[in-house]
A protein has these predicted regions:
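Solvent-exposed, acidic/flexible segments
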Residues: 39-50, 69, 73, 107-114, ...
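Serine-dependent carboxylesterase/thioesterase catalytic core
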Residues: 81-169
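C-terminal catalytic-base region of ester-bond hydrolases, centering on the histidine
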Residues: 152-232
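Bacterial N-terminal signal peptides
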Residues: 1-9
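Boundary at the C-terminal end of the N-terminal hydrophobic targeting segment
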Residues: 12-14
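Active-site catalytic motif of lipid deacylating hydrolases and related acyltransferases
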Residues: 22-100, 203
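Structural alpha-beta junctions
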Residues: 58-67, 123-130, 231
Length: 232
């Protein structure tokens, strides 16, 4: 099943900084929202929940939103640094780091990737307002680094499918609030269950693919993101 996750999409050419459309550096007080996709999904696949939400969030004043492939964490990190470099000197000052407003969300392997990215930002002294993981897959996707203010986790544990991370916890509970560890259920043979967009996903993706296709999940993710956008 893990092999299926990696092969479920056709491999595409790698994403680069020039594929990201947000203005750099970010305008003052703007929030940068980065969604990271699972599997080997293409960064601009319009059928993926990560991409759909990024495009929707772009319509919000004061928000810059991008979707990034999980193999491109380095690209995401460079983009964030470029976005925060308000004076263009390629060195982030204490003030430039302090003013960062960053939100990260990811699905499947993208859930693990956003925590890799958050840890890299932590090493650079860059704060993160929120991380949201959707059916996150990975060995290091349950400890939320101390630079993250709040975190939420959604998962499923149905039979014959990839299981998402069940419980995230804060490396430092005094600095990070865990908002949710919420389980979704997708029983087999339920007629009104979410339906993935392709036959391959419907046939072999199981509940992991159904969760990715569930609009209720993405409404929850969006709700947490919009709450974080109000944070001062």
């Amino acid at each position: 099943m893990v092999i299926f996750l990696l092969l479920v999409s056709v491999a595409a050419s790698g994403q680069s900084l020039r594929d990201l459309s947000s203005t750099t550096p970010l305008p003052p007080n703007n929030t940068l929202v980065i969604g990271i996709l699972g599997g080997i999904e293409h960064w601009n696949d319009p059928n993926r929940g990560i991409r759909k939400l990024a495009l929707k969030l772009r319509q919000t004043p004061g928000v810059s939103a991008e979707s990034i492939e999980n193999r491109r964490v380095g690209t995401a990190l460079r983009f964030i640094e470029k976005s925060l470099d308000t004076n263009g000197d390629r060195v982030l000052s204490t003030e430039e780091r302090r003013q960062a407003r960053i939100i990260l969300y990811g699905q499947s392997l993208g859930g693990q990737a956003i925590l890799r990215l958050a840890r890299a930002l932590n090493k650079r002294g860059i704060p993160v307002l929120l991380t949201v993981q959707v059916d996150s897959v990975g060995r290091t996707d349950h400890i939320i680094p101390s630079n993250v203010r709040a975190a939420a986790n959604f998962y499923q544990h149905e039979l014959l499918t990839v299981w998402g991370e069940t419980k995230i916890r804060a490396a430092d509970p005094q600095k990070t609030t865990i908002l949710a560890n919420r389980q979704f259920h997708y029983p087999p043979l339920v007629s009104d269950a979410p339906k993935p967009d392709t036959w391959v996903r419907r046939r072999f993706g199981g509940a992991h693919a159904r969760m990715e296709a569930d609009p209720i999940v993405w409404k929850e993710v969006e709700s947490y993101i919009r709450q974080a956008l109000k944070t001062k």
